[in-house]
Amino acid sequence: DAVRSKLDQPLPLGYCNAGVILESDVEGFEPGDRVVSNGNHAEVVRVPKNLCVKIPDNVDDESASFTVLGAIGLQGIRLMQPTMGECFVVTGLGLIGLLCVQMLRANGCRVLGIDFDSKKCERAQKFGAETVDLSKGEDPVIVAQGFSRGRGVDGVLITAATQSDEVIHQSAEMCRKRGRIVLVGVVGLNLRRDDFFKKEITFQVSASYGPGRYDSFYEDEGNDYPIGFVRWTEQRNFEAVLDMMSSGMLDVKSVITHHFDIENAIDAYGLLDNPDALGIVLNYPSQSREVLTKSKVELNVQSTKDSDPSTPCVGFIGAGNYASRTLIPAFKEAGAVLDTLVTSGGISGVHHGNKNQFTTASTETKDLWNNDKVNTVSIVTRHDAHAQQVVDALKSGKNVFVEKPLALTLDELDVIDKTYHKANKSNTVRLMVGFNRRYAPHIVKMKEL
């Protein structure tokens, strides 16, 4: 059931977009600013400040939307530490590979591009690279020797996707002594020791778009790394890519092959296996601020309209694994009317709301506190959010079922105690904490021993 539940749940796609700020509570960004971010493909995204960068005035939104992809390639290039006049191989001339060709050329390097697709090789040539067309039987190692004037190339940037280990082997053969290999794509990694030992070749895997990636301290909490110690964070890589677009050193328009309105996104994803497809742009329609910023969606208007007033009418905060697989079904089976589901992400709220016949899906808890139909609130959120949500629910006169823990500190517990007794004087309310593990079969058995 757990596996089926996961497979059934929709996941937000994409991580490259450009748009206009609607709301901002951080310094440096104002409503109306044009920005790029790594937010998902959606009409509205909420993005941490370190993953968002303003777009220069002379860069159009369409080109800017490729900034994050450019930063993925740029981070791989930074790891190779190229210097002017060096020669590099780019293996795999897809979208990121072609962007890397341009950035290496802008850095004063000679570039040899390798691919099976003749058309992609032709594109790379237009950007100033020499190429190896594998579909014509050309040997990349022999060509690389000639390209490097018999010395071996200074480095190889792998932007290909294949299960074969041959890419790594050939990369090592192409390199000079102490050459560099950086993997941006995904290839087989059964390395041959001799390939690297004799030449002292370095091999490194590039992690996405730069320092800060996957670090909650940087991304979620918004703390920057000091520039004196980390010159190129992921945000500063975004800026560098946009600067190259602004100066004309990075031509994105030439790699855009298709445009789709978001209503036809399925057709766009159907092109991913098409060798002629490179840059695919999804366009969203212009909508009013009121439509874009609405916090709730009506799902099943009939579900509570004619319900018995004595029946528990429940609102849920949280739809994680335990809530969606265990608690919501348990309330539903017990005969409770499910009214409002509040989640931090709209996708999960609408999905689980429709699945369990909730009336409304929302991203704001105020839609529960101000809902007179809801008499009971179930809180299944992060532990540090429980106390304040319990207090708010009690103040609004709701019965509360909260998953353990009720609070994290004695001060929080004291506030809950006072709020509960005050609420109970004016309107009888119930507060219950769910210690669900006490009913686990093993715990029950242990108590019996």
What residues fall within each predicted segment?
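C-terminal capping/lid region of NAD(P)-dependent oxidoreductase domains
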Residues: 146, 150, 155, 182-186, ...
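Glycine-rich cofactor phosphate-binding loops and adjacent beta1-alpha1 units
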Residues: 80-82, 122, 127-206, 371-381, ...
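N-terminal Rossmann-like dinucleotide-binding module
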Residues: 293-356
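N-terminal Rossmann-fold NAD(P) dinucleotide-binding loop
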Residues: 97-98, 323-327, 386
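Beta-loop-alpha module in the N-terminal Rossmann-like domain of NAD(P)-dependent dehydrogenases
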Residues: 158-168, 360-418
